[in-house]
């Protein structure tokens, strides 16, 4: 096995017995693939079914009302974005590109005859159709400078669905759901009548729809019911027994007798195949029935007197005595009736027709019109147009390819072509037929929670729908413009207004429910947010109406949606996460991968199955035992089939799971020993990992699952090598790789990677990249070159490994509290940097412009000390709460001054009397260091000194960066050709003769540009130098072009909002150490709050003097049932012990041979998966050992982790007791504790619930206008509410004076509180109480009801 650059530095020992079959697919593909499909930029690759292409093709051509103009779509192009991703974030712009559509305007001769079209002119041009947001490489969008994610939606798939309402007997219903257009419902009531609804409006008889489709009453009956023939004569009535085989399984309502009156089949018996044979053998072709039975029947077809043409009875009329007489009179002795005798099937439609008062198609169309447009007078043309527009015109109604496929599959017919997206008559007839079958018990209702009936709508599809909405509005505008614009040479751009498209897309990205502010606490929260699948949003469910069933875990979730990761609270089960290996197919259905089983042998062939396909197969678990030939070891194995867990013969198995972790999401797959935890706690563990704050120093988990490197790689926070090569240069800002062109598919000689430094994330955490390679290191494509935030050697590192003791300590771990050692604070283990952004905006007001200036009235010099001459804080300044960040003045209205004030003003020349200080100040409770300032100004007033200074610094930095980049390219080109050309014969060179040998000394005197002008006799060498020359010149041009583009973007004017003159952004870095009140958690849902930070000397310690880092309450485990944390602690202790063993070996010797022996014991003595140490050279072995001193990292994959025996064996090798317990001593007394304590290493996280963000105190502040009570909440700088329950508590204690103080002067007694303040100032300790303002509010509200209530000031004595 080969190891990557980062893996060689620190190999993770892997447990788990299952073979590695399939790599976890790229975690962000659900976002990137979907948008790529929507935005096929490369026309050469074909845009046949790409999103934009298909929408444009469906919307065009557009024809003018008079038929003179036709606008056709030809092609589209997407331009280059104005700014790159970083620039957009800085400027608060949207990362988008212009969409230019090539349109062809065909002009016809207006004088030509109506039916013939003579083309007069064709005009083509590209028309700007708005800006389309582009997706960044990490699957996000930058909208107005903030990074956003569009969450995928799980919604009901288009198609036909059948359901049952349990509240009513026989209440079955069918619904045809299109991709866009009107919904059509059919439903049974308790009487067996079939009703229809369009768009959930008023119901009407289902047969009205059929008549509107053109069916007659006779045809409707023929389609939905069997008919039987009755003969009658003087002896009575007889029923012909035609199609006996169709009667199988039906209940007989009469005896069947033969010619000798022997009963062959008795009444009230279900007819069997044997009975049918008996009847045929006896030659019985008809059976006598009585009039009572005949009178329940109805006529199947119109009965017409052939002689006169008179209609005796219509189809569906009841068979009555008078009807029979009329038939006899005209010589008709047989009658075709609807078969209610042998089956009830025909009665539903027959009864419905009885309720249906319409007689023909026109009446049916009018009835539908009245339902949909009540109050509108029905005109013949509009009635027909309305009905056709509902289901039969593709621009208004579309099932889409998904809906057509589902509808055909559900009705079990392929009569309708897959390319027809509107409804056909056979679809509607088929749905009603299936509904009748279900009512008769011959079909099954659908499970709407089955993932075969729910599909994922990803970002590309949602933007496509928004684009379609915008384009529909544009289309209407084009039609109007064609008839209004009168121009000699009309061009496409004269009649196209693209604003509706821009508006529709902007609305979706800025205010759509599924376009969300990216969760950017750490790399895992980013990845999880992009893989989230929500059932909420437009066209989805609402959390208030969603029941238990839709939220519950369904059997089809297996391998598709994670059964664990979902929010707690009202959204539980409605927001899910994609499982590790799941993917979305072309139809939007979720698929899971399986290994194919052929003739009892498990192959490595992978097939993805959707939930619909999976129902038909028997699937074995990933942990099923196989022999060396991949055959099943056991004859009876546990499998899944049709959503049930079953035991079955191994010969029946058709597929097998790919991996044990395929059923859980990426976040759940990061939890070691997940299989030993209760699901509720795992849910908390998975959710809390997303809230972990990245710390100053990242540390890998000693006990991981092997998923850490996959999440870190796919999150896009690490820098990954694009090509094979050697590290040429490294510093904190960039990494330069000299590319090995022979092993890489690129002509670039150099790859330069710029690192992100101290950038603010969406959650105010700090994004910073650190290189992990050194100059001279050889790297392969895909190797990690630099760690991002919360990653360590390319592995996700959300927290730190701490030595944990499960023991109580003086009540400081009561109720999940956590006792921490001071060492953790000293070592900055959980110190995190948070970057806050403060914005100051200078606007143009009615009274004049606001001004950002250092000249502020009534502010001391010391307050302005940290500002520059422009009134903006210096970079590097340490700012405290209340310090001015940006000094700003706002004009105020002129006041009438007294003569004395005017005199004083004149004497002291005070000009700033008519302005008020509106500076941006540091909020309370925060302090930090200013790390960056950005100034944005509009062009009108010219640029300020600070803005010009920042601009100059940015241009200088860019010039320096590009110069250095070019210098690197020069040195790489030099070194690549120097070895080849030294000693070669010259063809032509300035200063040397032809045929001379080129020396190193001669080259040293020339610049590289002159080197490349030398020509050589050797053709191959000449070609190589020619290639280097071309590359060098191209690189020079490219770098100059890049610099000019960068310079242009830096100096380009800023588009500020209307009325805004200047915007200043100040970024302050705040360092937060861990302290009591901060929330911490493990990965098993074991969360708690830090109760105390204890000096190291007081912490319990081991026999060798090592103090523990954390004391956790052992009572927090039994009731929570998250035993995984105990196993993690044991395995973590073993890992620590192995690290100590390696450290001791290193202290004795640094010989590679000795170290290899120790590593062999550590890595390969326990567990099935071995580490190939032979793949590492001696130097790599030494580096590996140095990196393992703190502990050997271990991977224990979920559902395939380390067993108890493995942990015990490792503890033994590490030099610890196999029960993981040890004697601890009290740090304060030095005495041992009574019993041995479980001690181990656990990975603990600091969560983004920091006490600094929550603690808040107020003495004075703002009041509510109406009640005059202090505001509430930290954001409003509010007070502490003294609510009803607190008042009752004081009442219960009889604390009258305290209560009076709380309800009056400390709250809303305006006069009282002012007097109280005055008394305190004067040193008087008395309290004057007046009426609280809230009483006045109550009094006024009561007065509004017409009741005069007032306060009685008189005392009882009076």
Swiss-Prot record:
Biological processes, Gene Ontology terms: DNA-templated transcription
Main EC class the enzyme belongs to: transferase
Role this protein plays: DNA-dependent RNA polymerase catalyzes the transcription of DNA into RNA using the four ribonucleoside triphosphates as substrates.
Keyword Transmembrane helix: no
Domain of life: Bacteria
Catalyses which reaction(s): RNA(n) + a ribonucleoside 5'-triphosphate = RNA(n+1) + diphosphate
SUPFAM superfamilies: beta and beta-prime subunits of DNA dependent RNA-polymerase
Gene transcribed to yield this protein: rpoB
Entry EC no(s): 2.7.7.6
The name this protein goes by in its record: DNA-directed RNA polymerase subunit beta
GO MF, one annotated term: DNA-directed RNA polymerase activity
GO cellular component, one term: DNA-directed RNA polymerase complex
Native species: Francisella tularensis subsp. holarctica (strain LVS)
Pfam families: RNA_pol_Rpb2_1, RNA_pol_Rpb2_2, RNA_pol_Rpb2_3, RNA_pol_Rpb2_45, RNA_pol_Rpb2_6, RNA_pol_Rpb2_7
UniProt xrefs under HAMAP family: RNApol_bact_RpoB
């Amino acid at each position: 096995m080969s190891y990557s650059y980062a893996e060689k530095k620190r190999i993770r020992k892997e447990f788990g017995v299952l073979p590695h079959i399939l790599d976890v697919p790229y975690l962000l593909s659900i976002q990137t693939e979907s948008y790529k499909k929507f935005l096929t930029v490369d026309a050469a690759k074909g845009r046949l079914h790409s999103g934009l292409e298909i929408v444009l093709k469906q919307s065009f051509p557009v024809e003018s009302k008079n038929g003179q103009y036709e606008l056709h779509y030809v092609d589209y192009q997407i331009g280059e974005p104005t700014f790159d991703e970083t620039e957009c974030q800085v400027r608060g712009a949207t990362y988008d590109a212009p969409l230019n559509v090539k349109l062809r305007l065909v002009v016809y001769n207006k004088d030509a005859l109506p039916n013939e079209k003579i083309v007069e002119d064709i005009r083509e041009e590209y028309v700007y159709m708005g800006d389309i947001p582009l997706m960044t490489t990490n699957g996000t969008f930058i909208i107005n400078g903030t990074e956003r994610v569009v969450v995928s939606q799980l919604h009901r798939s288009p198609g036909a669905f059948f359901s049952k309402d349990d509240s009513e007997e026989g209440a079955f219903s069918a619904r045809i759901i299109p991709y866009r257009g009107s919904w059509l419902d059919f439903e049974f009531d308790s009487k067996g009548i079939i009703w229809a609804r369009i768009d959930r409006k008023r119901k009407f008889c289902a047969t009205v729809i059929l008549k509107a489709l053109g069916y007659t009453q006779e045809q409707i009956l023929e389609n939905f019911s069997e008919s039987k023939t009755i003969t009658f004569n003087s002896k009575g009535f007889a029923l012909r027994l035609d199609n006996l085989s169709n009667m199988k399984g039906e209940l007989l309502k009469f005896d069947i007798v033969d010619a000798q009156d022997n009963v062959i089949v008795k009444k009230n018996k279900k007819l069997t195949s044997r009975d049918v044979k008996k009847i045929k053998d006896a030659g019985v072709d008809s059976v006598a029935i009585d009039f009572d039975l005949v009178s329940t029947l109805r006529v199947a077809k119109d009965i017409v007197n052939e002689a006169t043409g008179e209609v005796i009875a219509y189809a569906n009329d009841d068979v009555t005595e008078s009807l029979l007489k009329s038939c006899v009179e005209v010589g008709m002795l047989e009658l075709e009736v609807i078969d209610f005798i042998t089956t009830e099937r025909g009665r539903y439609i027959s009864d419905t027709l009885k309720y249906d008062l319409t007689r023909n198609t026109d009446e049916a169309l009018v009835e539908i019109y009245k339902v949909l447009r009540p109050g509108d007078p029905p005109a013949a043309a509009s009635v027909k147009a309305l009905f056709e527009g509902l289901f039969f015109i593709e621009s208004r109604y579309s099932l889409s390819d998904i809906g057509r496929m589902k509808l055909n599959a559900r009705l079990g017919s392929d009569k309708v072509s897959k390319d027809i997206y509107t409804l056909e008559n056979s679809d509607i007839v088929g749905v009603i037929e299936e509904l009748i079958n279900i009512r008769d018990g011959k079909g099954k209702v659908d499970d709407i929670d089955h993932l075969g009936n729910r599909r994922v709508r990803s970002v590309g599809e949602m933007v496509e729908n928004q684009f379609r909405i915008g384009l529909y509005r544009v289309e209407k505008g084009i039609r109007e413009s064609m008839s209004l614009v009168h121009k000699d040479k009309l061009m496409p751009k004269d009649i196209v207004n693209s604003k509706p498209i821009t508006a529709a897309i902007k609305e979706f990205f800025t205010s759509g429910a599924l376009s969300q502010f990216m969760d950017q606490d750490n790399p895992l929260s980013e990845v999880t947010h992009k893989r989230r699948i929500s059932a909420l949003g437009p066209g989805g469910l609402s959390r208030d109406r969603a029941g238990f069933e839709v939220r519950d875990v369904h059997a089809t979730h297996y391998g598709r949606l994670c059964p664990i990761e979902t929010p707690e609270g009202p959204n539980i089960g409605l927001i899910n996460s994609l499982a590790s290996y799941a993917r979305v197919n072309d139809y939007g259905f979720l698929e899971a991968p399986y290994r194919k089983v052929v003739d009892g042998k498990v192959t490595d062939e992978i097939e993805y199955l959707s939930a619909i396909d999976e129902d038909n197969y028997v699937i074995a678990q990933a942990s099923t035992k196989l022999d060396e030939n991949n055959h099943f070891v056991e004859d009876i194995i546990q499998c899944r089939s049709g959503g049930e867990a079953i035991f079955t013969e191994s010969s029946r198995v058709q597929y097998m799971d790919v991996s044990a972790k395929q059923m859980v999401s990426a976040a759940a797959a990061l939890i070691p020993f997940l299989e030993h935890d209760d699901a509720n706690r795992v849910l908390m563990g998975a959710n809390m990992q997303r809230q972990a704050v990245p710390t100053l120093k990242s540390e890998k988990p000693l006990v991981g699952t092997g998923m850490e490197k996959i999440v870190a790689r796919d999150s896009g926070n690490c820098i990954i090598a694009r090509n094979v090569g050697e590290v040429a240069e490294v510093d904190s800002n960039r990494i330069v790789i000299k590319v090995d062109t022979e092993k890489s598919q690129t002509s670039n000689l150099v790859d330069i990677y710029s690192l992100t430094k101290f950038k603010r994330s969406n959650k105010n955490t700090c994004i910073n990249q650190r290189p992990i390679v050194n100059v001279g290191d050889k790297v392969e494509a895909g190797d990690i070159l630099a760690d991002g935030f919360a990653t360590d050697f390319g592995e996700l590192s959300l927290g730190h490994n701490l030595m944990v003791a499960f023991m109580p300590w003086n009540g400081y771990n009561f109720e999940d509290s956590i006792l921490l050692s001071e060492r953790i604070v000293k070592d900055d283990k959980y110190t995190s940097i948070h970057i806050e952004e403060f914005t100051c905006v200078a606007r143009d007001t009615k009274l004049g412009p606001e001004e950002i200036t250092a000249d502020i009235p009534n502010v001391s010099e010391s307050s302005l000390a940290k500002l520059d001459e422009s009134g903006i804080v210096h970079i590097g300044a340490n700012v405290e709460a209340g310090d001015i960040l940006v000094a700003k003045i706002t004009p105020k209205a002129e006041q009438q001054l007294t003569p004395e004030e005017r005199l004083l003003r004149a004497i002291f020349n005070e000009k700033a009397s008519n302005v008020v200080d509106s500076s941006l100040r540091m909020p309370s409770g925060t302090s930090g260091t200013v790390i960056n300032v950005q100034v944005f100004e509009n062009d009108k007033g010219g640029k300020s000194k600070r803005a010009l200074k920042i601009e100059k610094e940015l241009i200088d930095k860019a010039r320096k960066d590009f110069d250095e980049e070019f210098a690197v390219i020069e040195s790489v080109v030099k070194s690549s050709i120097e070895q080849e050309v030294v000693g070669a014969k010259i063809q032509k060179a300035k200063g040397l003769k032809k045929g001379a040998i080129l020396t190193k000394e001669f080259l040293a005197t020339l610049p590289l540009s002159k080197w490349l002008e030398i020509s050589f006799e050797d053709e191959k060498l000449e070609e190589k130098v020619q290639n280097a020359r071309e590359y060098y010149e191209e690189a020079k041009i490219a770098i100059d072009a890049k610099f000019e583009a960068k310079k242009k973007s830096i100096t380009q004017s800023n588009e500020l909002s209307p009325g805004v003159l200047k915007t200043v952004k100040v970024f302050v870095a705040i360092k937060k150490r861990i302290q009591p009140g901060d929330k911490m958690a493990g990965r098993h849902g074991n969360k708690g709050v830090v109760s105390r930070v204890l000096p190291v000397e007081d912490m319990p310690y081991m026999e060798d003097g090592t103090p523990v880092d954390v004391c956790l309450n052992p009572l927090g485990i039994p009731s929570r049932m998250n035993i995984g944390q105990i196993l993690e602690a044991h395995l973590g202790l073993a890992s620590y012990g192995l690290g100590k063993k390696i450290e001791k070996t290193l202290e004795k010797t640094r010989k590679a041979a000795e170290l290899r022996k120790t590593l062999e014991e550590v890595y390969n003595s326990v567990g099935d998966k071995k580490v190939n140490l032979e793949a590492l050279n001696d130097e790599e072995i030494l580096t590996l050992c140095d990196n393992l001193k703190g502990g050997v990292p271990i991977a224990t994959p979920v559902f395939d982790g380390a067993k108890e025996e493995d942990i015990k064996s490792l503890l033994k090798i590490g030099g610890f007791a196999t029960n993981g317990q040890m004697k601890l001593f009290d740090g304060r007394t030095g005495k041992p504790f009574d019993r041995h304590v479980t001690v181990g290493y656990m990975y603990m996280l600091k969560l983004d619930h920091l006490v600094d963000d929550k603690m808040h105190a107020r003495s004075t502040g703002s009041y509510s206008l109406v009640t005059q009570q202090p505001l509430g909440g930290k954001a409003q700088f509010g007070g502490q509410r003294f609510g009803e329950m607190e008042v009752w508590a004081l009442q219960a204690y009889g604390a009258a004076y305290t209560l009076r103080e709380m309800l009056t002067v400390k709250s809303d007694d305006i006069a009282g509180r002012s007097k109280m303040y005055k008394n305190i100032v004067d040193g008087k300790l008395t309290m004057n109480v007046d009426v609280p303002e809230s009483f006045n509010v109550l009094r006024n509200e009561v007065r509004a009801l017409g009741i005069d209530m007032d306060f009685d000031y008189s005392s009882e004595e009076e």
